[in-house]
A protein has these predicted regions:
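Thiamine diphosphate
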Residues: 1-112
Length: 112
């Protein structure tokens, strides 16, 4: 049984109906997931790509140095409206720098 954690996102709500814990931040979801991994569970974390900046510290100061495998990540990638455009462009670069490979990237279009 997979455990799901993350910050609520209306764009992927059909994929996260069975969430175990709605978190107040992306780093909180990643911290809970780390504990689950250490307990032998297989968690999944979901977030919008705008939340990637919030998980950089926990990835580089907890997951990477202690060689904790990353949880599966369901990532909603948005490039519009305007305030999402830059993060949308650098999302894949950030994931590569973090050496994050266990990802499902859900591209989102924006209808105005």
């Amino acid at each position: 049984m997979k455990l799901k954690f993350g910050v609520p996102c209306s764009k992927i709500k059909d994929r996260i109906n069975d969430v175990d814990i709605h978190c107040s931040s992306e780093s909180e979801a990643m911290a809970i997931a780390a504990g689950c991994i250490l307990a032998g569970k297989e968690p999944e974390v979901y977030m919008q790509n705008s939340g990637l900046g919030h998980i950089v510290d926990i990835c580089t100061s907890l997951y990477m140095p202690y060689e904790i495998p990353y949880p599966r990540l369901l990532l909603s990638r948005r490039v519009k409206p305007h305030h999402h455009s830059f993060m949308g462009k650098i999302t894949e670069d950030i994931l590569k720098l973090l050496q994050y490979r266990n990802i499902e990237l859900v591209n989102q279009s924006w209808k105005e």
